[in-house]
Design a protein with these regions (language model features):
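Conserved N-terminal glycine-rich FAD pyrophosphate-binding loop of Rossmann-like flavoproteins
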Residues: 44-62
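A structural signal for isolated positions on well-ordered beta-strands in alpha/beta enzyme cores
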Residues: 15, 38, 123, 223-225
Length: 389
């Protein structure tokens, strides 16, 4: 049987910009299919940015395909219930009818992917930034070095230099509001009585708008998402202003004290992108470079990993890279227009959306709408994702 990963007697080679979740997934999946892969990370080491992460069925299926699911499950957590609170009272409890999901620190997931990449023989270069790419398969590094490849993958984030150097047409939105994401000790004993193994989405609108997403990652680590309007100088301040948050969420004081100690905390605004195409010539964009998503949908990493994995699958079926890439995009690209406009609005005006839809219609219905948005993206991915044989 002909090995399509060899062309004119040579093994096909990929250069990948960016060693985040999308880049690592693409690197591992291609390497497992016989490619040689060089992965470029502009930083001095492989590390994850951010705090915690939710993975749903689609992302977990990718981890299974890569052979690291058990590694990731160890040291992560599935809450018994996803609760929604309104003014510090529980109004909704969802179990998602058995839909697989998991919470973990971003570093935990990134470490598992990085270990697998090295085990599979991916060549990883740190302090190596791709500053330019050409559709012919050529990349230029910050040190002036030029490299050639059968495939270039732009997994270099929202500010992708691979994407921008080629000139992909894009629409980009930055929201008026944002959030502070932190990992702190769980302090479960200090929190006292309560169901502190649950995810708890806490919404308050009076006397001011503040929200906390409480997400246990494992026995030791807690992921906190603290949301407030950018116009609120106290709620958006970093490091966090302890009194401001304890006043609204007094029962969380033990973990908020830990959060206030984190001097490197950031207030990040939501960013989303929409591109006309994800591929040109021998170049494919994945992850935030192609489809940065609103964190409220909790599908950015999962969809990035599915798209990266499916790219390798497509290239395993179609020998010609320039034929495989548009075929992959046609098959995998989510149709974001199918999402109701209310979900797209979350990304642009999160606080205004919350005020209108949660306070006026009830937190339970909003929780269900968020669930429906997640399930839409999960099913959009899993319908086209095939388990490796």
């Amino acid at each position: 049987m002909t090995n399509i990963n060899r062309h004119n007697g040579k093994t096909r080679h990929a250069e990948i910009a960016g060693a985040g979740f999308a880049g690592l997934t693409a690197a591992i999946a291609l390497r497992q299919r016989g490619w040689t892969v060089r992965l470029h990370e502009k930083g001095p080491e492989l590390r994850a940015f951010g705090a915690g992460i939710y993975l749903w069925h689609n992302g977990l299926r990718v981890l299974e395909g890569l052979g690291i699911l058990e590694d990731v499950l160890s040291g992560s957590h599935t809450p018994p219930t996803y609760e929604t609170w309104m003014h510090n009272k529980s109004v909704s409890r969802e179990t998602f009818n058995g839909l697989p999901w998991r919470i973990m620190t971003r570093q935990h997931l990134h470490d598992a992917l990085a270990r697998k990449a090295k085990t599979e023989g991916v060549e990883v270069l740190v302090n190596s930034e791709v500053i330019q790419a050409k559709t012919s398969g050529q990349i230029t590094l910050a040190n002036g070095e030029v490299r050639e490849a059968d495939l270039v993958v732009g997994a270099d984030g929202v500010g992708s230099k691979v994407r921008d150097s080629i000139g992909f047409e894009q629409d980009r939105w930055i929201s008026t509001d944002g959030l502070i994401r932190l990992i702190v000790p769980r302090k479960k004993k200090e929190l006292g009585h309560g169901e502190w193994d649950n995810t708890i989405d806490m919404w308050n609108f009076w006397p001011r708008v503040q929200r906390i997403l409480y997400s246990p990652c494992n026995d030791n680590d807690l992921y906190l998402g603290l949301m407030a309007p950018a116009t609120d100088p106290n709620g958006s301040r970093v490091p966090i202003q302890l009194e401001c948050w304890v006043e609204m969420f007094p029962f969380l004081e033990p973990v908020l004290i830990e959060a206030a100690k984190l001097q490197a905390a950031r207030y990040d605004r939501y960013e989303t992108t929409k591109l006309d195409v994800w591929t040109k010539g021998k170049v494919a964009l994945v992850g935030d470079a192609a489809h940065a998503m609103c964190p409220a949908i909790a599908q950015g990493a999962g969809c990035a990993m599915v798209n990266s994995y499916s790219l390798a699958m497509e290239l395993d079926e179609i020998a010609n890279v320039q034929d495989a890439l548009p075929a992959w995009e046609k098959r995998i690209r989510p149709d974001y227009r199918s999402l109701p406009s209310r979900f797209r609005r979350i990304c642009r005006e999160p606080v205004a959306f919350q005020r209108k839809h949660v306070r006026s219609e009830g937190a339970r219905s909003s929780s269900l709408r968020s669930y429906e948005a997640r399930v839409f993206l999960v099913m959009a991915a899993t319908d086209i994702f095939e388990s490796p044989s």
